[in-house]
Amino acid sequence: MFTLIFLFLFLNIPLLVADFISPRCFWKMKQNEYRDRHHGTGCIFLILAIQQPVKKEYFSHILNIQTHTENHKYALALAFSIYEINRNPDLLPNMSLIFIFSADSCEWESELSLIRFGLQNSDNLPNYLCEELTKCILALTNMNWATTVTLHTILSNFLSDQLLHITYGTFHPALSDHEKFPYLHQMASDHTSLALALVSFIIHFGWNWVGLVISDSDQGIQFLSYLRREMEKYTLCFAFVNMIPLNINLYMSRAEVYYNQIMTSSTNVVIIYGDTDSTLAVSFRMWESLGIQRLWITTSQWDVSPSMKDFTFGNKYGTFAFEQHHSEISGFKHFVQTLNSVKCPDEYLVKLEWMHFNCEVSASKCKTLKNCSSNHSLKWLMVHTFDMAFIEESYYIYNAVYAFAHVLHQFTFQKFDNLPKDNGKEHNYSCKKLYSYLRKNHFINPVGDRVSMNQRDKLQEEYDIVYIWNFPQGLGLRVKIGMFSPYFPNGQQVHLSEDMLKWARGSTQVPTSMCSADCGPGSRKFRMDGMAACCFHCKPCPENEISNETNVDNCVQCPEDQYANTEQNHCIRKAVVFLSYEEPLGVALSLLSLCFSAFTTVVLGIFVKHHNTPIVKANNRTLTYLLLISLIFCFLCPLLFIGHPNSATCILQQLTFGVVFTVSLSTVLAKTITVVLAFKIIASQRMMKYFLISGAINYIIPICILIQVIVCAVWLRASPPSVDIDAHSEHGQIIIVCHKGSVNAFYCVLGYLAILAFGSFTLAFLSRNLPGAFNEAKSITFSMLVFCSVWVTFIPVYHSTKGKVMVAVEIFSTLASSAGMLGCIFVPKCYTILFRQDQNSLEMIRVKSSSNVHVS
């Protein structure tokens, strides 16, 4: 035991020491004088197991620890856990756990004097029991990893069989090496889910540009690798990564660089991760005091609650802390509220206020404190001084004490059951055996949480998200606003009560932290070489491409039947355009077609009615009727071009056009040949006369039609007309027209019609001066001249237009050429039949014939 005293003097570090001595020396000391100064980071506790009950008043002396708030929380957590265990009849029955520590400050000199006094004057201690069963030392510490390694190494050399070392601080990978530290156990988990929790939290607020400040240590580098891997999955970027060196001299030489990097960075969110007793803590406090306006994200071990004395610049954004989730410890607040000092009921309140307001405490007990008031309730202080809900380290202490109690329970009663009841000699066992039990131990703690002492069996951590609410300045409320659970689906792992957030001194607007402004709908991201994945420029989408989300890498091409709107964030279905009966142009052309066909029908009726008149007889009534009927169909052909095209109408358009016009032109050709033969034949040409009289000339018509039908058949065989959907010629429109199929075949049809028209024109032109009262040569000449002019003009105009205008040009050409033949050949005759009947007689025919002969 004197070796242990030497180690305490040498290390000058706080320990929580559990000494299983059943029973050893139990006594209670009175309070000593307070010393107004700051001390170490913890207190030394001796935890003993005795075979008698312990009253609750025993725990009141823990309130006399005059140290900073963090240690006070740990001491209260230790006292409460021991208090619960002692009240549990199923855990360590007939045994009680107690702790011994100095009534003065938690400094090693007073604790050492307590240990020395207890060991040297054990006979004078009350409740002394002489039977000593065995000993085992539990070292429960919260130090940085280097100090922990030093402590564990030294204690192991001196107390290898009596050391059971448990840490409740931050997990460090170096301490998880069981070969180097076989009897060291870490209560904290390795925080494998912390990186995912931070990334999910960042994504929840739409941030992608954050800064990171870590300690330049193995722990910091490991956390950086975890965090970088998670951030790369979701395209999040570091604005900067500051690795704060542990060496104070190296840090001081670069402190200004770290400060300028944070100040000049465009990010508003900075993550802090590292040891709280390192140079990183110095940096963080300095940045806070200088009023750097950033939103800080830390872990639970950082005490980021501002004190009421910190009336400096203040941070308008506040701080978030991630704490390991655990159920609420019921009864803890009531336990603390019912604890009072023996002599001075208000003394505990005064001490809490001293810790909160940084007041000066008088050297004597129960005196009025300078600049302080003791009239506040304990309940208020528990909320505003420090939250009495268990923090992460307090919860580790709670579970560590319970784990130790369970191990003692299992080992002790199993051992006693297996012992022979003989001479009652001392049965010694080492902490090595206890540790083998401890590593395998798992239990359900009183709040219902499953606790496993095996690191491999520990579940992924859930985290409570705490917001340090500092509005008004200095309030420093720790408010739980949500939690993170890795067991929920992606995107639903963070749950926040955002109505509890107050940004920028009361504002509800979430601060932004983006490397680049969002590329809104209608644009895409464009990165230059060397830019981070989160940094980009915005470029509008190309023509007929859209983006309906923010920050897309590539725009999406609209389908063939759709086009992009002016904002290029939505595809609009293109209007289907064709020459329809509903639009004015279609209505006009269809009416014009019907009117011409009706007029032609009237002309046909006139000729039929006056079929015995000389003017009708003189021009071959059969050919006249055939020509008028074909013209009726020529005028009706445009109706096939109007309306929604389909495969049938597309084929009928061209075939009907070609065949019907062939009938018309071949009839005109036959009439022209008839005129020529009638006036050019001489008496010796009996064969020609027979040919004219017999009507053999009429066979020209079917022969011409047959040739055109053969051309059309070849056309249909090679490449028939079909529906053509043109989605590119006009913006926002799908033009549906009939494609000609084989263009060569189409021009062959037109060419054949041109040959017939040109032949008729030539013969009629040569016969224009032949005698005869009703010579049609001149009429046919003019009609063919109109026909040829129309279709010669049609070709260039047809190729220069598209869509329904092109269809309208073809319809107009059909109507114009047909109207030319109707007007030039039949309108003058109708005028004569209806209005100049005096000229439609045999006498007038003889007069005209004789005059024509005389002139000739």
UniProtKB/Swiss-Prot annotation:
It is found in: Cell membrane. One of its GO terms (cellular component) is plasma membrane. GO terms for molecular function: pheromone receptor activity. Disruption phenotype: No response of neurons in the vomeronasal organ or accessory olfactory bulb to Esp1 and no enhancement of lordosis following exposure to Esp1. Coiled coil: none annotated. InterPro entries: ANF_lig-bd_rcpt, GPCR_3, GPCR_3_9-Cys_dom, GPCR_3_9-Cys_sf, GPCR_3_C, GPCR_3_Ca_sens_rcpt-rel, GPCR_3_CS, GPCR_3_vmron_rcpt_2. Pfam families: 7tm_3, ANF_receptor, NCD3G. CDD domains: 7tmC_V2R_pheromone, PBP1_pheromone_receptor. Residues 1-18 form the signal peptide. Residues 608-622, 680-690, 767-778, 828-856 are cytoplasmic. Keywords: Cell membrane, G-protein coupled receptor, Glycoprotein, Membrane, Pheromone response, Receptor, Signal, Transducer, Transmembrane, Transmembrane helix. Expressed in the vomeronasal organ. Residues 19-586, 644-658, 712-745, 800-806 are extracellular. The chain crosses the membrane at residues 587-607, 623-643, 659-679, 691-711, 746-766, 779-799, 807-827. Glycans are attached at N94. It is a multi-pass membrane protein. PROSITE patterns: G_PROTEIN_RECEP_F3_3, G_PROTEIN_RECEP_F3_4. One of its GO terms (biological process) is positive regulation of female receptivity. Belongs to the G-protein coupled receptor 3 family. Receptor for the Esp1 pheromone. Mediates the response to Esp1 which enhances female sexual receptive behavior (lordosis) upon male mounting, resulting in successful copulation. This is Vomeronasal type-2 receptor 116. The gene is Vmn2r116.
